[in-house]
Amino acid sequence: MSTKHHAPTNSTAKDTTSGLFHLNTLPAVQAVAEQLEGTCLSSTWPRLEADRTEQLNSNATLFSGGSAPRDVWAESGLGATIDASVVATGSPLSLIDLCSMTANTILGINDPWVKLKQAAYLLSWRPHYLTARIGCDLYYRVARRILRCFDKFGEPGDFVINLRQCNGSDVVELALHAAWKAAYQYPARRKLAAFRGSYHGENLTANWVSEHQPGRLLAERPDNVVFFPTPLVDAAGELTEDALATLSTLERDGDRYFAAIIEPIQWRNSVHTVPFEFLRRLRDVCTRKSICLIFDEMQNAFGYTGTISFAENCRVCPDITAISKALTSGHGSLAIIVAKKAYREIEGPFGAKSNSGNMLPLVAVDAVLDRLLGMDPEKAKALPAWLPLSLAAELQTGLLTTAYPRAVAMIDEMLAELQRRFPSLIGASKGMGLVRGLVMLGSDGQPSVRLAIAASKVCLIHGVYVRQADTAILIKPCMVLTQAEVDAALIGLSRTFEDVLRIRDEK
């Protein structure tokens, strides 16, 4: 295979209309893929251990509750589209994923650049896995790239990073541990401020500090977690009395708190965005009272609000930022904290999880940063000559400045049209950027959990995937959403809401 490089503008490779394509459509990759055909490594090799009906249906003998296959069987996918079939009928289904496979795949399904970088790494002699006691260049490159995104909130070197966690629950626990460790020498600081409407994960620690709990786990909630009301503004856009009272309480009793943890966008709370003014005032109180401010950014970081971190949106920098999900765009499990140096001390076993030694998620983060922010110009000159011009161009500019505003504009237009078509069913549009919610209204005009659940179930029949988020449906698409996919989603959601209206009227 040729090692010749080029600047994208000089490429003679066949172009595509967007940066999305399946890898096996590239001639340079086809040469390898052809060698796999007819072998057990072929992607078309028979792999079902039973007929499709058995595989599609929930099998209580084979699967535990909560993990059984559901209503749709996926065959392939690209961007926001999953090529699938329906369980009940076996008929083909083109499914538009409006939840980026539940809040992970910011770049959609099968992003070619992330897969190419991972494939290149796998073809190398580099270790695919390293224990926490052994380092490599990849750790340092990814760490420095992420930390540079926080330089605007201080001087280079003001922040540190931990790259050795596997999921959002892990990093919530790690963030709380780092805050607790920093305050340990002050015995009076043992309280944690949390908020109604919050959801921080499913492990024991994250469960304790969440209002939305998946179920009671092993022990009762500790008595040092104080839940304050959901921060809101009134009709005039001013902070409510409850929000102001929260700030006053923390000002008065701040010496008793070691940390405050908050989600900038509470997705389980009907996709509620915390008012920026509240975050600014909370930051001021936490600074004055030496309370560690933690942002749980699982739902918004790495592109969903057009930035790497929410600090860039609200101009409020927390002491610790916890990030997961979109980090790898679904190409592996990884979670991180970025913390001010005062919170760098971490004790074992919190510092590193076993599966965090997998190098492929780190390769994925590096590639996702290429896609979101653009590559270093010198590195971009070394892009392969056979790479389609469209992808090469995107890697020069980054998707945050191009694809993100287009995707938001398309979603804004779609949500407005749905509200116009179904004024008695659809209430407020919540959230921001690509983290959005549509509130479902009952016949009494009040937000309805029942109808939000119904919509999240019915939508699959009509070729759209959304999630229920309390009284709203969560709409959180990938950044590379196309107009054709939005048009198909509008049709599918319109049919969904017509069914939900019938369900509502039947009661």
What do the predicted segments below correspond to?
Residues S2-K507:
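Conserved N-terminal phosphate-binding loop of PLP-dependent enzymes in the Aspartate aminotransferase
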